[in-house]
């Protein structure tokens, strides 16, 4: 759900808080066996090695990945166990809660509506949702749609509201979007609109309300019609109100725990707390398909895709990271950029990216890791795209 700052993540060890808090620690050194005169020993698979390390060295219950190589072929990977209680295997390409990858889906729908002339990127939010955004330093007449999508609105994050301070008691609780928004509006604005950049889930909560107001249809129906069905994401969906279980084979996922404390199974949850900022369920393969389709123009006209890829510095997400409209770019060690978003739910973390030449990778773990482990995930994405 939240791809945010390290300070906020530290506040919540057992729940989702920003996936993109990441930083620190070093990657794994990969070695290859030298060939002999008689035969060459098989080269260890670097992706599998890194997933194994996320489980063995970093303590993740499970890790899953799908990698699409330079040859256009995809390969899936798993490590760890799918259920800590039964030690069941991790389902290959199992369903996961995609967290803030949802923001890219939401941004696509908004930009499609821009292309249709129904929304103006630089039009005030108040034009479409009059009177909705009012608070201490907050005024929807001064916040544009672009600023929502780019996290430059100054809106505070609703995840910082007291009602969301502990995920355990709200595992099965339904939240109306307005209730979440009220938690944000009770806080002071982070800065004047356009004056700075700060990741805030509230921006995409408002974007979901904007979609509903302009189309007259539920958010989930618009995302399904305009994105999921359009490019054939067969294992991706927006959970219905009250739907708490995942629909297809999946690994169990757990709240992060203090050392010595048993992990709390958070596989089931009411995802209304994330809604248009982080509720999408998907698989690593479907996420690769989505971002590849997005970058190749299958979801947006050229003008809107160019707007989406117009970025501002977002160094809080990592060195060299820049944020566009619902997607971010990250420099690769081998040159070029990886485009995507990544996401964290209460008990999943995903990292990934696609390149201009069609390479793609998505990696997911089944608990929210600390900053060094999150850095290992980012390093694994880089290594997979650069090999």
Q: What is each PLM-predicted segment?
A:
Residues 51, 71-72, 103-106, 110, ...:
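Residue-level preference for non-acidic, small/hydrophobic
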Residues 1-40:
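Secretory targeting and sorting signals
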Residues 137-338:
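Short, surface-exposed loop or secondary-structure junction motifs
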Residues 82-84, 153-154:
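Solvent-exposed coil/turn segments that connect beta secondary-structure elements
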Residues 2-3, 38-78, 262-387:
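Catalytic loop of the DD-peptidase/beta-lactamase superfamily, centered on the K-T-G motif
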